[in-house]
Amino acid sequence: MARQTYSGPVRWVIVDDGKQQQQTTFSRKHWELVFVRPEPFWDGSNTQARNLQAGLAQIGGIEWVVIIEDDDYYAPQWLETIFGQFKNAELIGERRARYYNVQTNIWRRMENMTHASLCSTAMRSNALTLFRDIATTEYKFIDIVLWEKAKSRHLFDSQLTVGIKGLPGRAGIGSGHDRHFYGEFDRDGSKLREWLGADSQYYMNDKDGKNATQADRTGRPIR
């Protein structure tokens, strides 16, 4: 986030339900950080919906919301691109997600042409209202339901995000986190370097959690 090219004001709502609060060193002009610590703290169950609702409670109806997941990769142009795309619809996102499992070195370009992964989705206005309604435990895959129900939606191609799978810590719910996730084998890490450039160093061979980003993993600072 420190390298994002978007120069406008940002209010970053960070939801952290780990037992130990994540250390934060991030500071940037025109950025406000809001920390939310929902309780009870994570006990091994799926707290995605609970945490989303806790974050949404801090957000007003006229705000534009960009979902950022702490283990995924966002190119520096991501926020700038997103805000440029908001002219097209109330719900916007990047299609054909790119997934990379750092445990198995398996990568895959997904075929999602009718929805974006939650990590690469943004919303405003009626789409934000809809998201509040469906971000509940009733739905396992909230992103798919959101894109099915939204009336004003737009998908674009940008290759600016990568869903990083298999990091240490709590397991993700998507198929990419499974060790049996199929795709192409990246024998020498060249695909990860192609996708992430120098930032690949934070993910390559991260099998012991030394580069993990969640407080539940190592407490690595937010940046």
Residue positions per predicted region:
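Active-site-proximal specificity loops/subdomain of glycosyltransferases
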Residues: 21-62
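Short beta-strand/loop segment that forms part of the nucleotide-sugar
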Residues: 8-19, 36-40
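Active-site acidic short loop of glycosyltransferases
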Residues: 8, 59-63, 88
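C-terminal catalytic/acceptor-binding lobe
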Residues: 133-223
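Short, acidic, metal-binding catalytic loop of nucleotide-sugar glycosyltransferases
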Residues: 1-9
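Conserved catalytic core of nucleotide-sugar-dependent glycosyltransferases
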Residues: 66-68, 75-141
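Active-site acidic Asp-centered loop
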Residues: 17, 68-70
